[in-house]
Amino acid sequence: MLDIRLFRNEPDTVKSKIELRGDDPKVVDEILELDEQRRKLISATEEMKARRNKVSEEIALKKRNKENADDVIAEMRTLGDDIKEKDSQLNEIDNKMTGILCRIPNLISDDVPQGESDEDNVEVKKWGTPREFSFEPKAHWDIVEELKMADFDRAAKVSGARFVYLTNEGAQLERALMNYMITKHTTQHGYTEMMVPQLVNADTMYGTGQLPKFEEDLFKVEKEGLYTIPTAEVPLTNFYRNEIIQPGVLPEKFTGQSACFRSEAGSAGRDTRGLIRLHQFDKVEMVRFEQPEDSWNALEEMTTNAEAILEELGLPYRRVILCTGDIGFSASKTYDIEVWLPSYNDYKEISSCSNCTDFQARRANIRFKRDKAAKPELAHTLNGSGLAVGRTFAAIVENYQNEDGTVTIPEALVPFMGGKTQISKPVK
């Protein structure tokens, strides 16, 4: 959520930033109009309360002097009714303002390129060279079924489309990837490992920006009023919701693996085969809490943390800056890391790393103190995939496939695969 002072002091800047996302800037005028009404109501209410205090003193004085106080008692009742009415009006305006403010996205950083869609994202880095095969490479969805690593048909029978059973070495590879990523982030990148709740309440979803605007993308347990998480970013960021982080704690760096659940509303017909776009998938997440002046350097560091996984696995990738028309709701700046997938003959997103500045912290009321005597300030929050496990799985299977149908295990994963160096079709 944006600071109301930005609307008051820099309305044109806010309008231009909103327009860059392709949204209607008239909401700024709506907010300013409501804010003016709100301030007038507060002023009027404060005057009434001051008068009520004075009338209360007059009543007490008249009673002490044994004088008739009926007139001032009547005024007191009228003032009470008027104050109650003003408070009701103020509450209504506050709700209207919050309803609008909570749907306005974060302000985009000045160095984000302008554009309308992912076609306008700007490549800033490329690592590795896509492999040239001496045979016709197969898509990962064919490889995993031939090697008995996955079963899409039985998953569809049990749960519907966009689900998968990982079986045999497929399940082992998924588990190995999660363990490898978490181990690297905790032992080399300085993150604290967390196991997170995978069902969260509405306040939690509101804090990170999923609610109220993106409810259609979520799965909800209606009876309990809980939501399945679309990413571990949600519970990790909300760890400090409604808290003041004490001096000396920041920077705080969390990493955690979780299942992620997404309805994929609006993605019909896209990536319908394989592991790229499922309703349920595993992901290792990185979340950071930073002092405002440190958050931009933290974004660069976190992005290189994600890239280090791909480099050690030997998977070619590129980094792009998301343009103004493609960046997410809560982010001020986002890097996407895209891995090379031979089946697409293209790079596909495998990680998004974002600086959300104080946007989520304001929604979730996450503050910190620089020292014990300091006034609490809003922290900056960052999040990044480190990495999407299923897409890493697909990239390994496709990039490390062999002509005889086997798949070579990247050297970095061998210790996490029990020493296994290759995946072959099971004997039975």
Curated annotation (Swiss-Prot):
Its EC number is 6.1.1.11. It catalyses: tRNA(Ser) + L-serine + ATP = L-seryl-tRNA(Ser) + AMP + diphosphate + H(+); tRNA(Sec) + L-serine + ATP = L-seryl-tRNA(Sec) + AMP + diphosphate + H(+). ATP binds at residues 262-264, 349-352. GO terms for cellular component: cytoplasm. Coiled coil: none annotated. GO terms for molecular function: ATP binding; catalytic activity, acting on a protein; serine-tRNA ligase activity; transferase activity. SUPFAM superfamilies: Class II aaRS and biotin synthetases, tRNA-binding arm. GO terms for biological process: selenocysteine biosynthetic process; seryl-tRNA aminoacylation. Keywords: Aminoacyl-tRNA synthetase, ATP-binding, Cytoplasm, Ligase, Nucleotide-binding, Protein biosynthesis. The keyword Transmembrane helix does not apply. Disulfide bonds: none annotated. It is found in: Cytoplasm. The keyword Aminoacyl-tRNA synthetase applies. Its main location: cytoplasm. L-serine binds at residues 231-233, 285, 385. Pathway: Aminoacyl-tRNA biosynthesis; selenocysteinyl-tRNA(Sec) biosynthesis; L-seryl-tRNA(Sec) from L-serine and tRNA(Sec): step 1/1. Homodimer. The tRNA molecule binds across the dimer. Consists of two distinct domains, a catalytic core and a N-terminal extension that is involved in tRNA binding. PANTHER family: SERINE--TRNA LIGASE, SERYL-TRNA SYNTHETASE. Belongs to the class-II aminoacyl-tRNA synthetase family. Type-1 seryl-tRNA synthetase subfamily. Catalyzes the attachment of serine to tRNA(Ser). Is also able to aminoacylate tRNA(Sec) with serine, to form the misacylated tRNA L-seryl-tRNA(Sec), which will be further converted into selenocysteinyl-tRNA(Sec). This is Serine--tRNA ligase.
